[in-house]
Amino acid sequence: LERAHKYDLIITGSTWNQEILKARGLTHVVNVFQGIDHTLFKPIRVNNLFPDRFTIFSGGQLEYRKAQDVVIAAFKEFQATHNEALLIFAWANQWPLIMLTIANSPLIKGVPEISEDNKINYSSWLESNGLPEGSFIDLGTPANREMPYYLASADAAVFPNRCEAGTNLVAMEAMAVGLPVILSANTGHLDLINDSNCYPLAKQAAVKPFKPYAGVDGWAEPDVEEVLTHLETIYVNKVEATNRGQRAAQSLGNFTWDNQIRELLGFVDDLCR
């Protein structure tokens, strides 16, 4: 805090982040959300990359904070009654020690093995956690320009994250292309959610501190059954899901990098006057 008070300005990436600093007596704090590349992430026509499958996308580096354990638990139950369900994911994590935090979850067992060339073996891990072979696809580390292609193949996206300091760029990109998105209603995600642009996860409990995260105030534990309920709703009512996806894209329409950088530079200009 002593060092923070010495800065002329602190810029945060979410309202939650800003409020934490203000609650600790820092008054020189402003908020600027990150932007989206709208030349790539915009409402696009659904492709048929995975025909005859109900495809669910999950993105973000594998770790307890990102709650892929919740995705796995919910998908396992959903796929048991919908054999055509397919989980596609981009969970690459360049920080193995952070990835190991997923073992903190009681919903899954073990962690993926990492080869000598630092490749993560998701297949055996997911199968050992009850996902049938052929029910999931690891997208690896696709280039950002390739992501709209994969998102356009999905019927839904799931982000049950326990905490987001910012606003979760992958979730923003999924919403911007018009996907029906299941989104945990906590921390930075709250800046993305309105009454009708997603399927919010509101049934949440407190998170207990765990290494290396000693402070988890504001974090929230999502409810697996609520994720499952939303997946069933999207599966059954595709018209409403499409409408929510369209409203999601509209709500993210102003989050262009041009707009966000202009706002950022405005604060810097004010500081220099």
Where are these regions (language model features)?
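A short, well-ordered alpha-helix in the C-terminal region of glycosyltransferases
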Residues: 226-229, 233, 240-254
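Nucleotide-activated donor-binding/catalytic signature segment of Leloir-type glycosyltransferases, i.e.
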Residues: 100-145
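Acidic anion/phosphate-binding donor-loop and adjacent secondary structure
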Residues: 36-52
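Acidic donor-binding loop of glycosyltransferase active sites
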Residues: 149-166, 179
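Carbohydrate-associated surface elements
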Residues: 16, 35
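Short hydrophobic beta-strand element within catalytic cores of glycosyltransferases
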Residues: 180-183, 197-202
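Conserved donor-binding/catalytic core segment of Leloir-type glycosyltransferases
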Residues: 49-66, 72-76, 87-89
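C-terminal alpha-helical cap of glycosyltransferases
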Residues: 257-273
